[in-house]
Amino acid sequence: MSFNINWDSIQKESLSAWTAELLNDALNSGKRPNVLCTDIQIEDLSFGTIPPDFEILEIGDLSSDSFRGIFKFNYDGDASITLRTKVQANPLKIYEDNLLDQFEDDQRELGEFIKPRFVMATDILEIPLNLKLSQIKLSSIIIIVFSRSKGLTLVFKNDPLESISVSSTFDRIKPLARFLQNKIETQISELFKEFLPSVLYKFSQKYTTENFADFHRELLHTQHPERNTENRVTLQDIDPEAPLIISPGSLMRLTTLSSSRQTLTLGGKISADKLNPDIITKNYFNELIPKTYNKFQLKADKVADIAQNIHSIKNLQSRIFWKNSKNNDKPHRRVVCLGDKDKSKEKCKQVESESLYRRSVYSQGSIFNDGASDVSTLTESTEVEQEAPNTEFPKLQAVDLKPDMSVETIIQNSSQEKHRKVKPIDDIGLIGRRKERLRELLKYDVVDFSMPPMPGSPTKFFNTNIFHDSNHINNGNLPIRVAPPPYQC
């Protein structure tokens, strides 16, 4: 398991200044070496742009107040640090100082007696030194142990330093450059092994539970030195064992006390609620309701596509059902037929169009019948508005009438026309069905021409020519039966 470090967050001047101050105190602590004439100062500190890599190898202990883990640490970045100091260039002066350091304080007089007394040879000769450390490559396995009561402990299991680049003002002098390279590598190895863990341990003591009250008082005194912080009550004074944990009852009392001194606040969040985010107050629901609003807007075409939505819902329900189903039972579904009304409407429209076509007139004329025969004749009449007939249906031919024709001649011609051979089989069947339908309709309507036609009567579509024949006159009425427009045959 590994994790990434947000390296950009540490590229701040405040952190760089704090780290430089911490390193200055660390480098100048203890007795200064005789080769140095002044303290070491950090001129420039850069963390670079490449973060280190941490890999978790083992988590031994993980609780609310303690942690123990083993990590693998690797770094090969572009961090750099520039140091400035002054070194002693007189070797006799360095020898004399090192000779005196071999004797203890009570033997100082003996050291002054045995050292050589050089007059001008032991004078101080200072040379400024600028030292830059870059191209640092580290790799090690570290153990981190943290406790609220004891602080942070860091241990390197091996030497973390693999390589480092040292550049100084003595690079042209090869012996001095090699000496500085070896000396700095040795010092940095000791720095990671001994000095760095002790610095981190002392620094972590300021932020643990034991020293939290002192740190809080120092912080208040730094921000407000004029205030008297001796009478201030802290969380450490209320509950020394667990200063950062407050019971719900105590928090409710603090909330009531805090709200009693707040006036003219409309729905504002009480300051005491920040101590425990798990508590539910009257303002909790005011913050929760806006979070339940649906912020995802759907397009109109997605909502209108009912079939696609139902298909998506069906797939989702099927996945949930089969995921939670322990047996092989099939899901029970309610079947909803879509588009049945539309299909029925289309069927009705088709039937109406067929009936409308049957009512269309293929030829113009009136129908005469002598009452004794089922054969009918046609006379010329005015045109009637009609829809264009389909080419699939045959067009019936009307019988040509002459003024000197009698009814018998018309009937005879009609009989011959009736027995005329028709080649298409479909035409014969269609004409036969139309004649059967005509016979059924001719059984009813008997038209009296002495009376005006009734509204809606089929005779209003025709201008009938009446043949005056004494043989077919029955009490002044002609036995005429008129068929509706679709059956003018």
UniProtKB/Swiss-Prot annotation:
It is found in: Mitochondrion outer membrane. Coiled coil: none annotated. One of its GO terms (biological process) is mitochondrial genome maintenance. Keywords: Lipid transport, Lipid-binding, Membrane, Mitochondrion, Mitochondrion outer membrane, Transmembrane, Transmembrane beta strand, Transport. GO terms for molecular function: lipid binding. InterPro entries: Mdm34, SMP_LBD. It is a multi-pass membrane protein. Residues 1-205 form the SMP-LTD domain. One of its GO terms (cellular component) is ERMES complex. Component of the ERMES/MDM complex, which serves as a molecular tether to connect the endoplasmic reticulum (ER) and mitochondria. Components of this complex are involved in the control of mitochondrial shape and protein biogenesis, and function in nonvesicular lipid trafficking between the ER and mitochondria. MDM34 is required for the interaction of the ER-resident membrane protein MMM1 and the outer mitochondrial membrane-resident beta-barrel protein MDM10. Lacks alpha-helical transmembrane segments, suggesting that it resides in the membrane via beta-sheet conformations similar to those predicted for other outer membrane proteins and porin. Belongs to the MDM34 family. Component of the ER-mitochondria encounter structure (ERMES) or MDM complex, composed of MMM1, MDM10, MDM12 and MDM34. This is Mitochondrial distribution and morphology protein 34. It comes from Komagataella phaffii (strain GS115 / ATCC 20864). The lineage of its organism: Eukaryota, Fungi, Dikarya, Ascomycota, Saccharomycotina.
